[in-house]
């Protein structure tokens, strides 16, 4: 997160300044990430806008004062305030500062999160951007903030280090009646290439319209939720690379997406929470894909958080969500944790994910 006062959920890491030597702590993460294969370390920067838990973000800001009226994993969302021009100028500097600190920590680049209904997606979408000034109205105006952030990151970092990578995570389609269209998103990708964005990571959907439920059968067959959009824009981009994140589970599906030219690379999220060495094992030919996850949507995001806690605590096992008994145990614990969090509000005393000691799982450390 780029702002102490704007977090999306419990446990969000924040990179705003060097308080408590956090740049050194992030540098440690970078060093571990790069070993032993000298992998690239790119950190995602984000601002939730209106889409942050009411308990943690009681006075949110957004492109406009459009309230997100739903509950998500036990969270409610406060009505947002439309950002003033001063707010926007300050926000631009925050993105630049966080990118600069990431560079100081040794990251090879940053990803600007413009997807999943968070702040920059709120500016892009006519559903949430009702502004009548230079940041609203036309697709160009709604995207203006993103390009001003890119210019600030160029000023703070890339003028000093041209090798610093810049990525934009983008909604391919918002799956809302008045959301951004694939054509608008395609035009945006072309403009991002002109702004020297190194790669775009295509995803989609918001809390209001979970994209993972609204995909074509042909897309489901190839696993990636947003691959059809990638196929449309990749031939139009000369230098900017296209990645697709969302839905990949089998090695064959990942390979096919790249071999057929739909994208240059694939992103994997939740499967890595269960199997930290999944990528290594796929490349070595030891496994053919990720294990099945029986935790129902949308709770499986929370379930992945539990797995990350198990890894962070050095537990011997990571829960196996392909085992129905383990899933049932987790669902019961999740209900208890949700009730407990509500009772202690506004105090925040945990990361928000239910804690569970695995009974059926993977000995990932062996």
Region locations from a protein language model:
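Flavin-dependent oxidoreductase catalytic cores
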Residues: 1-366
């Amino acid at each position: 997160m780029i702002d102490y006062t704007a977090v999306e959920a419990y446990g969000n890491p924040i990179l705003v300044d060097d308080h408590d030597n956090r740049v050194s702590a992030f540098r440690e993460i970078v060093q571990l990430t790069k070993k032993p294969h000298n992998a690239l370390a790119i950190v995602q920067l984000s601002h939730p806008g209106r889409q942050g838990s009411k308990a943690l973000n009681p006075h949110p800001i957004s492109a406009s004062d459009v309230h997100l009226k739903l509950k998500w994993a036990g969270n409610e969302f406060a009505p947002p305030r439309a950002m003033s021009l001063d707010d926007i100028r300050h926000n631009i500097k925050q993105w630049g500062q966080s990118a600069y600190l990431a560079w100081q920590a040794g990251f090879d680049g940053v990803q600007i999160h413009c997807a999943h209904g968070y702040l920059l997606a709120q500016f892009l979408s006519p559903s949430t951007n009702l502004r009548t000034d230079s940041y609203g109205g036309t697709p160009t105006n709604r995207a203006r903030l993103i390009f001003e952030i890119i210019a600030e990151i160029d000023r703070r970092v890339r003028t000093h280090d041209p090798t610093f990578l810049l990525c934009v995570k983008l909604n391919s389609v918002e799956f809302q009646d008045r959301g951004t269209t694939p054509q608008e998103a395609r035009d945006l990708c072309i403009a991002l290439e002109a702004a020297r964005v190194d790669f775009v990571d295509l995803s989609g959907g918001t809390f209001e319209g979970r994209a993972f439920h609204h995909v074509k059968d042909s897309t489901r067959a190839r696993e990636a939720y947003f691959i059809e959009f990638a196929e449309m824009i990749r031939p139009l981009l000369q230098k900017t690379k296209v990645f697709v994140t969302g839905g990949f589970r089998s090695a064959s599906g990942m390979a096919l997406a790249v071999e057929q030219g739909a994208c240059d690379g694939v992103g994997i999220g939740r499967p890595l929470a269960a199997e930290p060495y999944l990528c290594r094992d796929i490349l070595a030919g030891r496994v053919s894909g990720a294990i099945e996850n029986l935790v129902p949507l949308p709770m499986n995001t929370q379930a992945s958080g539990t797995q990350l806690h198990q890894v962070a605590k050095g537990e011997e096992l990571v829960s196996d969500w392909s085992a129905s008994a383990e899933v049932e145990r987790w669902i019961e614990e999740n209900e208890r944790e949700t009730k407990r969090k509500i009772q202690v509000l506004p105090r925040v005393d945990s990361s928000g994910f239910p804690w569970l000691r695995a009974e059926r799982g993977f000995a990932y450390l062996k």
